[in-house]
């Protein structure tokens, strides 16, 4: 039976390839970061506008001085993002080529697909891959911590933590309170890390 002149076999669903899954996951993570940042800015008094960024399509924000602000362009996009295949148009073309190659060389009815020669990656991917390989290198063994430095750092952190707690108790500004809470959390995390160094 044909639908609009097409075979029913043309409509079989195939799960996304590993590359497509990575692209979708990276886009989802990027959208989550944008949403979190936008929420933070809205709490600081920014207004959400009915317009979107001409470059990336993200909803624009406006501060109290009426300056237009795009969270994605001004905070997330960096040189690292340009090399990220999930966010780069060139990587999308590579993905389309991979899909075409996979569909044009469908395996025969045998249980093992024929081996395919490796497809060379574009140069812009090589730098990102090298960065990943370097990041996965095993860490060097840590030198024993200098107890004087650890103790003086703990003292400074405890003083800063005490000061921030007192300031938070007397703060009437939401923005200041948010910043003080962030400082308290950072001090607590740093103290925890220093305690791990001591043990």
UniProtKB/Swiss-Prot annotation:
Tissue expr: Expressed in the early postnatal brain.
Pfam families referenced in this protein's UniProt entry, alphabetically: Auto_anti-p27 (PF06677)
Assigned GO CC terms: cytoplasm
A molecular-function term among this protein's GO annotations: identical protein binding
Cofactor-binding details, from the entry: Binds 1 zinc ion per subunit.
Function according to Swiss-Prot or TrEMBL: Might play a role in mitosis. Could be a centromere-associated protein. Antigenic molecule. May induce anti-centromere antibodies.
Binding site for Zn(2+): 53, 56, 70, 73
Major location (coarse): cytoplasm
Note: Two ORFs are contained in the Sssca1 gene, but only this protein is efficiently translated and expressed.
Subcellular location: Cytoplasm
Extent of motif Nuclear export signal: 173-194
Protein name: Protein ZNRD2
Quaternary data: Homodimer.
Co-factor(s): Zn(2+)
Keywords associated with the record: Acetylation, Cytoplasm, Metal-binding, Phosphoprotein, Zinc
Extent of Low complexity compositional bias: 127-137
Residues annotated with N-acetylalanine modification: 2
Keyword match Cytoplasm: yes
Residue numbers spanned by region Disordered: 93-148
InterPro entries tied to this protein: SSSCA1 (IPR009563), UPF0148_domain (IPR051888)
Gene label: Znrd2
Phosphoserine modified-residue sites: 94
């Amino acid at each position: 039976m044909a639908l609009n002149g097409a075979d029913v076999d043309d409509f079989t669903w195939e799960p996304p390839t590993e590359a497509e899954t990575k692209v979708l996951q990276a886009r989802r993570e990027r959208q989550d970061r944008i949403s979190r940042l936008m929420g933070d800015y809205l709490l600081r008094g920014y207004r959400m506008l009915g317009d979107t960024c001409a470059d990336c399509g993200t909803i624009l924000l406006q501060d109290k001085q009426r300056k237009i602000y795009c969270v994605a362009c001004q905070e997330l996009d960096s040189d690292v993002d340009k090399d990220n295949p999930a966010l780069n148009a060139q990587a999308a073309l590579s993905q389309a080529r991979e899909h075409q190659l996979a569909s044009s060389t469908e395996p025969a009815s045998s249980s093992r697909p024929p081996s395919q020669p490796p497809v060379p990656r574009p140069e812009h991917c090589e730098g990102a891959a090298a960065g990943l390989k370097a990041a996965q290198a095993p860490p060097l063994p840590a030198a024993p911590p200098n107890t004087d430095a650890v103790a003086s750092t703990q003292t400074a952190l405890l003083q800063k933590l005490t000061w921030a707690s007192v300031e938070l108790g007397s703060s009437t500004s939401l923005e200041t309170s948010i910043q003080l809470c962030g400082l308290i959390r950072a001090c607590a995390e740093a103290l925890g890390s220093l305690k791990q160094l001591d043990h």
